[in-house]
Amino acid sequence: MSDMRELLRANDPVLLSAVGALLDGAGIPHLLLDQNMSVMEGSLGIIARRVLVHDDDMRAARRVLEDAGLAHELRPDTEVTEDAALGGRIRLRQPRKGHRFGHDAILLAAATQAGAGEQVVDLGAGVGAAGIALAARLADVRVTLAEIDSRLVELAEENIRLNELEGRVNAVQVDAGASAWALSAVGLEAGTAAGVMMNPPFNDPTVHRASPDAARARAHVARADTLATWIGAAHRLLAPGGALTVIWRADGLQDLLGDLEPDFGAARILPILPRPRAPAIRVIVGAIKDSGTPPTTLPSLVLNDADNRPSAAAEAILREGATLPLAAPA
């Protein structure tokens, strides 16, 4: 039972029976144990009993009970934290360990352009931080959160509900490198998106040692073909003239521009500096599908002032929901 965790604890036989029936109905295997015992015999309602489910089934089991109005009976999910972003405008549930969202996701959302009623795909969405931040800023935009990791997809779905974005935002499980047929199977039809936003894995495996956490390693470490694969997927998804917005490490800018050609043009490059006069650590690039216009560079965003305090510009974006120049059409 090393791969099982406690879903809830109770000594009410009616509640325990109802929970068992709900889990059985959902096809979720579970065990019922006395709190301090390794037996499945009852304890006459004196000692609380534990309902255990496998790690892989925990998110689904919690959702079943939440949908049944039993969220208050659930044990706290110690594997997940709930954190505020955009100064509390959105809240996001994410793994306590492993891949967690950061400033990059919020900066990406602040740089993404979209019009009323348009569809934007957040490719490699994780728990949905960037796409949900975009949807919170633009009330008429529809967003699809596309993510390969099933656990992160489940958390993204929770975050959609947590931020009351059902109907405008949805989450699908799919690999960014999937075929056009596989993308279509989850509702991502070729040539239909007005925008694609993405924060691909970008750490160089020859420089950065991969995390022992598999999900974190997949989210952070790039393969040799990662960038080209993701850009190819974006090109397939975008409608003619659609906009791609990508955040990447600054020392890889030339690789990024090379992979954008010849399918994207009108690239606008926005360097992100950690402090004044320091080398850029990130670039955000916006480009237009099938445009032949040459690239331009925009004024840099400086995250911290000379005293290492957050700059006013960064605070406006990260806490107040301000946008970057890339969010406006060229």
Please describe what each predicted stretch is:
Residues R75-A116:
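Class I SAM-dependent transferase core
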Residues K97, R223-A280:
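Conserved Class I SAM-dependent methyltransferase catalytic core
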Residues G117-G126:
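Conserved class I S-adenosyl-L-methionine
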Residues V127-D140:
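Conserved SAM-binding loop of SAM-dependent methyltransferases across substrates and taxa
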Residues R142-E147:
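Conserved SAM-binding motif I beta-strand of class I
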Residues E157-A190:
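S-adenosyl-L-methionine
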Residues P200-T229:
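Mobile active-site "lid"/loop adjacent to the S-adenosyl-L-methionine
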Residues P279-A330:
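SAM/dcSAM-binding transferase cores
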